Amino acid sequence: MAVKNTSCMLCVWDCGIKATVEDGKLVKTEGMPEHPVSMGYICPRGETLPHYVYSDSRLLHPYRRKKGGGLERVTWDQALDICAENLTKVRDKYGSKALAIFCGSVGVENIEVAAFAQRFKSAFNTPNLLSVENICYRMRILARQLTFGRYTGEDYKDAECIILWGHNPDGSRRMLGDLIREKVNDHKMELIVIDPKRTELAKLGLHIPIRPGTDAALGLAMMNVIINEDRVDREFVDNYTKGYPELVEHIQQFTPEWASPITGIPVTEIKTIARIFAQSDASCIIQGINTLDQHQNG
């Protein structure tokens, strides 16, 4: 029996795991305490990796559908020939742009497949490469690139105030949830949870049960408060941003009084969370994947 250090590849967090191998077979997975990010945590998906690897439903060989129904196993050479023949027919009849490629995730957990898909796309001369990002977090990446110049991450370890905006770390990012609990219990952090659901973490801080789909209105009203009460870090704004005067003018219409009936949040609470967020020396917002990305007002 041997224990190997590796990582879980079932989602983008890439948590560290210790894999127990017996007679050449994976028999158990558990968290890796010394891992700098996951710190010993793995979710139920990571814990059940052996079942995933040895599932009776896992495809280990290529199959093709028979004319009368059902599937028949073919060799890899046969499968590649069938794919090449059909792809050539499509290109000859409709052009190369008729092909769309879906490669699953393009994150770190699937980077090899994503890299190959990019090369195959170029070789076939089609621009159509799709991934789960289209129904996941691509909009967030684009928004941060347009706003900050690159895709940035949250510096939550040093934060004095965290807003969990539509995010419940206990679901699949427990190490973050545990860190927040520790800092809140030690009175080292202010916690605000903006979520229609009262999660376990929401019970530790200020819970704002927003009406679903009205997040943009709340964000605009918070900016209105921060700007008009002069709670802005002017040195940062002057040195690292563009368009602030235009933002000041634009934001005047989005008052807490305007946002309150839209969001279902009292005016006093909108002002309170804006002030808490602005007065902390180190604040960050951690948004949930999909909860905001897939809505026009997210």
What positions do the PLM features span?
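N-terminal export/assembly segments and adjacent metallocofactor-ligating motifs
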Residues: 1-229, 266
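Short coil/turn segments at secondary-structure boundaries
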Residues: 94-104, 132-135, 234-240, 261-262, ...
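A general boundary/transition motif marking the beginning of the first structured unit of a protein
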Residues: 108, 210, 235, 239, ...
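Active-site-adjacent structural elements in folded domains
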Residues: 145-150, 237-246
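Active-site phosphate/pyrophosphate-binding segments
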Residues: 222, 241-298
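Membrane-interacting alpha-helical segments
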Residues: 225-243
